[in-house]
Amino acid sequence: MSQLPVILKAESIHKSYRMGATRVNVLKGVDLAVHEGEFVAIVGASGSGKSTFLHILGGLDRPDKGAIQFHGRDLNRVGARELNRFRNKRVGFVFQFYHLLDELSVLENVLLPAMVSRSIVGWLAGRGAARKRAEGLLDQLGLRERTGHKPYQLSGGERQRVAIGRALMNQPELLLADEPTGNLDSATGNGILNVFETLNKAGQTIVMVTHDERIARRAQRTVMLADGRAR
């Protein structure tokens, strides 16, 4: 794996938050390099800064100090508009609580990133191809018969698979998953991990946060966060 190029690199990441009169240092110089096609699990206890670090990796938050490089480019030096494009087109996010829109169908939820990334004219011109891709993703995820359903009509595992389809809609180079099985029973969570393994075998780069070391072992490499540092 080390012979493949590094697509994401974190260098000496620091992050703190203020709680009343106290400043809490969450990350104290975290380093990480993720190679193309790698499946990395970041594991640590509750409050160790795992989710904070993942959000910084994906451009959802900025560090107090340190650099996040994507293909060698420092995201801290990127403006807000370009950072939005980066998050929409090059990174896919999967969260513990799905964040699906109940008023939209399963298919429409998966289509959302494609709709957001295009102008009205561009969307009208390309919606047929986008719909075909969304339907293909749902088919691969075992949801062919659910495309017209609303999220509230689905099981937890089905909703998480919809969220994965949405994350993959724009063919991101990097998939970031924050406790993707944390809201699921063990059998359903295992099914989601099987999906991640299949995606990774097809070349998808994945960074997953979990508090469960058993889940982390499904990844190719595990990074432990403790006392604000990576081990």
Give the residues covered by each predicted segment.
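Conserved switch/coupling elements of ABC/ABC-like ATPase nucleotide-binding domains
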Residues: D227-R231
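ABC family nucleotide-binding domain
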Residues: P5-L225
